[in-house]
């Protein structure tokens, strides 16, 4: 299943996108996008989920559609962190936030929260959780992370973050540590602005520690941040679009071999400054595996066309993309073969 030699180009490109849709049922426009543009992965929000029964049926419908059109399982993704960041319906289990778990001082509770979350998600048909936040919340004015972080202490974030990752992956769901290389020292929210982290190497090392340790411990996914890090990337591009950060640091220096996802490319940090469609190509050029376009699937369709053109004229290296596709398909195989608790 993980060989991509016989996959046509559009189907291959579609593997590199995760997209969302409105409502609790598949929209005709979304179905058409999967059929024409071979979108291979889905993100779910609260807008898609009314009950456990409905979510299970929806996930089965998504898998049937994607398998028939793309020939492979879909990554069905969700932001189910616990606490304030929950997408599931009230008849599902919502574990406490990262900071609440950390306040107990017992990281085994974080592991158990991960197992509970993953077991339920997997039973409902979801196989990727964009959690936990590995951000070190060192800025008290941070408007977006706050209690989503385990702590302002990198060792505490590492201890609890690794425990939750272990629990999620033990439960058969891919854990995705976010927001690399750290969203904890910002006073702006990348949903609505383009933050800059001005710290030098010593300061950045604090924020990188949980990610470095999570990679060593076997986290299967990492999500990028739409933040400028001048100490890491001298050009005025956020981490998501930086080959220096996404490939040289994350892949080469830290040795990460799992899947790299972008944060949503419709966030204003990207959309207002770089353009969602154009930045999707830049993210793939930087070494990201899966581009997330959460709300407007027509933007993903345009991005697929742009990637096709970039492969044709050499702006995007075909061999590098093939290696990335192989990682995605291997991850899908791994998830499909895992036993569910």
Mark where each language-model region is.
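Boundary/entry segment of secreted carbohydrate-active catalytic domains
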Residues: 2-25, 81, 164, 263
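Catalytic domains of carbohydrate-active enzymes, especially glycoside hydrolases
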Residues: 32-45, 116-118, 123-128
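Glycine-rich anion/phosphate-binding loops
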Residues: 51-58, 103-119, 153-159, 202-205
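A charged helix-plus-loop insertion that forms the helical arch/lid used to bind
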Residues: 92-105, 149-151
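Mid-to-C-terminal alpha-helical segments outside catalytic/metal-binding sites
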Residues: 309-340
């Amino acid at each position: 299943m993980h060989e991509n030699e016989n996959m046509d180009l559009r189907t291959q490109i579609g593997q590199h996108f995760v997209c969302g849709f409105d409502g609790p049922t598949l929209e005709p426009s979304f179905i058409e996008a999967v059929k024409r543009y071979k979108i291979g992965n889905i993100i779910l929000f609260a807008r898609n989920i009314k009950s456990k029964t409905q979510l299970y049926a929806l996930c089965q419908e998504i898998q049937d559609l994607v398998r028939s059109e793309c020939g492979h399982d879909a990554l069905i993704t969700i932001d189910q962190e616990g606490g304030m960041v929950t997408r599931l319906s009230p008849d599902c289990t919502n574990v406490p936030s990262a900071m609440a778990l950390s306040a107990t001082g017992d990281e085994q509770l974080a592991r158990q929260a991960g197992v509970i979350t993953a077991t339920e998600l997997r039973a409902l048909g979801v196989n990727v959780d964009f959690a936990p936040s590995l951000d070190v919340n060192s800025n008290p004015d941070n408007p977006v992370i706050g209690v989503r972080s385990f702590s302002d202490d990198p060792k505490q974030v590492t201890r609890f973050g690794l425990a939750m990752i272990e629990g999620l992956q033990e439960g058969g769901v891919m854990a995705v540590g976010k927001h690399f290389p750290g969203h904890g020292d910002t006073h702006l929210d990348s949903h609505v602005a383009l933050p800059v982290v001005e710290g030098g190497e010593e300061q950045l090392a604090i924020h990188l520690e949980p990610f470095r340790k999570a990679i060593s411990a076997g986290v299967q996914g990492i999500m990028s941040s739409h933040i400028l890090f001048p100490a890491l990337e001298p050009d005025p591009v956020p981490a998501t679009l930086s080959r220096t950060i996404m490939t040289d640091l994350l892949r080469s220096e830290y040795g990460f071999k799992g899947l790299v996802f972008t944060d949503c490319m419709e966030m204003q940090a990207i959309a207002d400054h770089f353009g969602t469609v154009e930045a999707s190509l830049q993210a793939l050029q930087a070494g990201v595996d899966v581009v997330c376009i959460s709300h407007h699937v027509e933007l993903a369709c345009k991005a697929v066309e742009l990637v096709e053109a970039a492969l044709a004229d050499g702006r995007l290296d075909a061999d590098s993309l093939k290696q990335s596709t192989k990682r995605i398909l291997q991850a899908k195989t791994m998830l499909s073969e895992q036993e569910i608790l």
